[in-house]
Swiss-Prot record:
Coiled coil: none annotated. Substrate binds at residues 80, 98-99, 115-121, 127. It comes from the Bacteria. This is Cytokinin riboside 5'-monophosphate phosphoribohydrolase.
Length: 187
């Protein structure tokens, strides 16, 4: 792994989000999340890309004076256009290592609308939280119902005993930014 600098000791929120779509509402949401994290004096840790929602969240955080830590696997440096403007850019060997660094660095997690990679990150951190590997807040910020199908399926799994109610309670699903940030706040 390589890094540009040392991160200040601040509350850190990992944001999991998309690396491909450029829907205006998604980019606006990601930008609002980045700006709000910075406004609170928190550090943003994200997937290290400078495209789609990843680029919007990090650019907005920096534009509002926030500290940004990008974590990107070597194989995606060019595909996701690594954000070399990050205050710290960690280049990992593998996707697994990327997720581990993000999880280790974060005090809380916010998931925005995204695809397979975003789901992978969410499910991984949720599973680890449920298993007691951490007690960090896991927030899904879903203002447009992007995750409604997933939530319905998970509810069915809980109803049939495949997912415990305790596991379901670990997920904090909100539809507005203020509630997401409140759920991530220290203390």
């Amino acid at each position: 792994m390589t890094a540009k600098s040392d991160e200040p000791g601040r509350w850190t929120v990992a944001v999991y989000c998309a690396a491909a779509p450029t829907h205006p509402e998604l980019l606006e949401l990601a930008g609002a999340v980045g700006a709000a994290i910075a406004a609170r004096g928190w550090t943003l840790v994200w997937g290290g890309g400078h495209v789609s929602a990843m680029g919007a969240v990090s650019s907005a955080a920096r534009a509002h004076g926030g500290w940004t830590v990008g974590v990107i696997p070597k194989m995606l440096v060019h595909r996701e256009l690594a954000d070399h403007d990050a205050d710290e850019l960690v280049v990992t060997e593998t996707m697994w290592e990327r997720k581990q660094v993000m999880e280790d660095r974060a005090n809380a997690f916010i998931t925005l609308p995204g695809g397979v990679g975003t789901l992978d990150e969410l499910l991984d951190v949720w599973t680890e939280g449920y298993l007691g590997m951490h007690d960090k807040s896991i927030v899904v910020l879903d203002p447009w119902g992007h995750f409604d199908g997933l939530r319905a399926w998970l509810s069915e799994l809980a109803d049939t005993g495949y997912v415990s109610r305790t596991a379901m309670e670990r997920l904090i699903v909100v539809d507005n930014l203020d509630d997401a940030l409140q759920a991530c706040a220290p203390g």
